């Protein structure tokens, strides 16, 4: 696979990352930073199905639009067996649910293998290509986990999740721990494979977990 070339000002990148890191860690900053996504269609334009089935097209389009996001929300749910439906004009979405209700929780694996289960292998392939494209120098959002609850809604119906909070709080807590463990495991796999640069090929982890990537371009 060929190297995709980006013209990066590494001094400005370092300045931006330090400013954001200082701000989020309560250190003095010369001005308040903000992060943003560049809104662009990118050229050439490939639809969701083409990007999903041929990662080289996703990389080509993403580099054209830098922060154009790969919709990776289904990745973690797929590791638990959630079926993902790929279509042309929308991100993949989950067809059906693995669990009908919280009573079926024991059917769910207590631990997943993020490098091999579900779409985990695909995710690592995309990460390889992102590292080839940008060397970990800029954020490319390929793995937005949302939150443990958000992933849980892809495994069990949302209404039943809300009922379980009242009817079976202990089982619900265990469910959240299982899902959170899958998110942590995915992060650990990415860090093991890609080191410190992994923070630039995943999105912020979401509101349900304290760990977050704050070193991003501003």
Can you name each region flagged by the protein language model?
Residues 73-111:
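A contiguous, low-structure linker/loop signature
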């Amino acid at each position: 696979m060929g190297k995709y070339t980006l013209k990066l000002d590494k001094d400005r990148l370092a300045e931006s990352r330090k400013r954001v890191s200082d701000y989020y860690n309560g250190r003095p900053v010369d001005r308040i930073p903000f992060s943003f996504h560049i809104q662009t269609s990118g050229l050439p334009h490939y639809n969701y199905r083409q990007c999903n089935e041929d990662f080289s097209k996703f990389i080509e389009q993403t580099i054209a639009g830098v922060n154009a996001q790969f919709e990776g929300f289904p990745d973690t749910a797929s590791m638990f067996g959630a079926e993902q439906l790929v279509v042309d004009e929308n991100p993949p979405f989950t067809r059906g649910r693995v669990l009908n209700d919280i009573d079926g929780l024991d059917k769910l694996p207590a631990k997943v293998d993020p490098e091999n289960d579900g779409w985990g292998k695909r995710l690592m392939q995309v990460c390889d290509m992102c590292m080839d494209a940008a060397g970990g120098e800029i954020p490319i959002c390929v793995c937005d986990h949302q939150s443990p609850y958000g992933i849980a809604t892809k495994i069990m119906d949302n209404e039943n999740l809300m009922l379980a909070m009242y009817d079976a709080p202990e089982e619900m807590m265990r469910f959240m721990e299982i899902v959170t463990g899958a998110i942590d495991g995915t992060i650990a796999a990415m860090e093991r494979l890609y080191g410190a640069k992994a923070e630039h090929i995943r999105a912020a982890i979401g509101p349900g977990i304290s760990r977050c990537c704050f070193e991003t371009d501003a």
